[in-house]
């Protein structure tokens, strides 16, 4: 299957690690030029060097901007005024007791998880609609429809992404612009691997053993009973970025390993 992404430029926010990095790699493999984003220039350049060792012909551009701020978004617009594919992957999460979350933490999660995507899409979607061609993808979470009591602030922002995505899809009615949301389940990113290593101190478990125990004890409804790999999410997002996905629009799409017990 050819995804026909040659000649397309994609921006993947938060793409120096985890799911974002895997998405950037997958898009580059399919021929898209990819803008690599992170807050630290050193990390951005390191990621570009790493991806070029995997994909020698890849066209990769650096974007060391803090997109959790209005200033950072404006700097990005000046550097890259137009893209064909926008993947709003940037996000923060942190388990916290609801009664201990201060107002400024709620605002921080809103600024990074919501306003980064709002600001970027406001600029880039307008150009896509004018051209009648483009792709916007929000990376949410299964927490959007199965909120977690241990991360109420995070879950709320993920639910909000679903509403924003659907509203924006309708703005592009009658064009070949699509706006969708992907909801990954628990995924084995670097941060999650670190968490697994700290969950069972003194038990000398391998990462695989800790993963199996975590899934059994904390994600019992998962059908696959393992953590999703970033590459699995990346392949799905790459397909949604391609012309082959033109009939999928305004959708909230689960890639959660069957974690959410629902037929819809």
Swiss-Prot record:
Active site: residue positions: 154
Cited InterPro entries: NAD(P)-bd_dom_sf (IPR036291), SDR (IPR050259), SDR_fam (IPR002347)
Domain of life: Bacteria
EC number of the protein: 1.-.-.-
Claim: Ribosomal protein is one of the keywords in the record: no
Disulfide bonds: none
Keywords: Oxidoreductase
Pfam families recorded: adh_short (PF00106)
Protein name: Uncharacterized oxidoreductase YvaG
Organism: Bacillus subtilis (strain 168)
Taxonomy of the source species: Bacteria, Bacillati, Bacillota, Bacilli, Bacillales
Gene that this sequence comes from: yvaG
